Amino acid sequence: MMTLEKFEEASELVKKVTNPTKLVFSEYLSTQTGAKVYLKPENMQHTGAYKIRGAYYKIGTLTEEERNRGLITASAGNHAQGVAFAAREFGCKATIVMPTVTPLIKVNRTKSYGAEVVLHGDVYDDAYQYACKLAEENGYTFVHPFNDLDVATGQGSIAMEIVQELPTVDYILVPIGGGGLITGVSTLAKMLNPKIKVIGVEPAGAASMTAALKAGEAVELDSANTIADGTAVKEVGDQNLPYVQENVDDILLV
């Protein structure tokens, strides 16, 4: 269950490994929309993305025994680097399963944080299934990229920073892949100020959250086609869906 106490704990914990990402006013977007538009530059984090937040908080909630067993995850990029970086900070071993088509630069960056990288399968789903197999065979602790409420709580620390810096915020727009980010951000935003509108932005060619909301449950798409590979998820997390149903006001397809 996601609680304000856990969000506050996560927000303090992730400060140890995140860079301050102050809101940046966009004159161009503000002119185009007729509103005051600010950007949250999470690309300025150590690993180049917000994923370090969820990975670090999740690993921080684990017992010493769970960490000592070694961590494992599957990812084609940002979550891989987030888990690798966080595992290094906690002094534990991490194994990252990545698709064989993962760009070499992402593989090398993940390795640079001390993780063991295993290349398997052509797509994320292949890598994920193999990671689950390795976790079962070796007793590793799995750190899911999005279908985990502790991971989502860590990502939600973004909302804490937005509201603290801009208390008058009316709308928060959040990209959707598997649903972890928008689960955390929307839930905390509504806790802090129920008047805030949270709008999801999802690829039209990988609209797995839209499909889940229509069906009332997580469903698997036949394919996920989008240039935004970080949001190319065929099935959203079933743990995330109830929070999205309750806290997200609308989803835009692009």
Predicted feature locations:
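PLP-dependent amino-acid enzyme catalytic core
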Residues: 1-254
